[in-house]
């Protein structure tokens, strides 16, 4: 073996890394052993030899591992194929339907209500020969600006809603007698009498006008109604749950019962039947014993409960009152409270610390509490006659809670029924239009919210029912207008509280990202790294393939 070949083999074994050095000065030992020029020539020979040997080794390894690499690539490819096939399935199963909605009509619904919600009560003056006074009154009505949402009309012929009866008297006064509007007035000329009649009509209808106005201002951002009547009325709904509860104090050790069925039949059902066309009232009853008594103090040898202690009393009683499972059915509570004998007779005080004669307190948007001073040792049953006066108070409170603000009696006259009918129509239309506007804002603000076909159908039904209600009002058909307005309210509520929309609100896009990231990040990162590695291997194999196809020099 020649010294040159021996030296080459020695350097390959001991100093293999020298062949990769680009600068000759780094090969310090070789330069001083055989000289600079010979070392340079020798290193070039070694470098080509090493590269040739490494390519041979890689080619041999590639040939040996080719089946294994192919299997590895097929396995990796299968993962990507599964992912690509799963994407359409995932998209189909998680994609939400977003139907188009008439946003312009929904956003303009409140202003449309203010424009089209017009009540037109009609009158006829009795004993008006030649209809001269009727024409004068109609002229005055047309000359004066109409009050908000009301357009009074005086007609010459029937049918009309009300009749005006003029009676000569020294004093001016007016009052209702069923559908007759009676005016006692001194003798005047036609022009003066026409102005007087119009003033009396607007004075009679001003409470109704204020009630409708308060409904509109409740949804206004600039005007906030401060009327106590507005704050007292219960939340609007086509149906209510009326809960009659007899709560017996903890000091009463004798069982007390009441003849509630006969009492309801005699004293409460007539009013419920009159209200049936306006709202459905579902009556329930209960008796609760050993109820914690109210806080009482002695005043003039009487036990009294302060007005400031009533909130605590209500909170205490609510523990014993059953709740309705229906969210859209507000509950009106009427509590008859029998205190313990130790604090009887117990009287409730008003805000001025005066004893309330009826011993009953009306609580806004909740109901009322009535205290019954009942000697249990002498009598253990409340007969229907004993409950008569209490039901008179309950009936009056029910009308107040439903929105009839100046109720003189506990019954519902024809005039009060019409008044409440108009009020319910206004409430239904205003609530439905406000719900549509809120729904439009909600859908606009949440682009990922699902809007199924059902919601689209509910919205269209609401708009159609509102239009039909306005048309019925223009024809002065209150019963038909109430039916359409109630349907509009129900459909709007079903659209706003649709289950698909509620779930979307509680599961926004941020929650989806929080769920997907922990699941797919640990899978995708190794797949991505493996993909990059396989790409590098494929590029290296192509390079080796090109080198292998280069012809060797002879």
UniProtKB/Swiss-Prot annotation:
Glycans are attached at residues 132, 375. Its main location: endoplasmic reticulum. Keywords: Endoplasmic reticulum, Glycoprotein, GPI-anchor biosynthesis, Membrane, Transmembrane, Transmembrane helix. Residues 95-511 are lumenal. GO terms for biological process: attachment of GPI anchor to protein; GPI anchor biosynthetic process. It is found in: Endoplasmic reticulum membrane. InterPro entries: PtdIno-glycan_biosynth_class_S. Component of the GPI transamidase complex. Involved in transfer of GPI to proteins. Belongs to the PIGS family. Forms a complex with PIG-T homolog, PIG-U homolog and GPI8. This is GPI transamidase component PIG-S homolog. The lineage of its organism: Eukaryota, Fungi, Dikarya, Ascomycota, Taphrinomycotina.
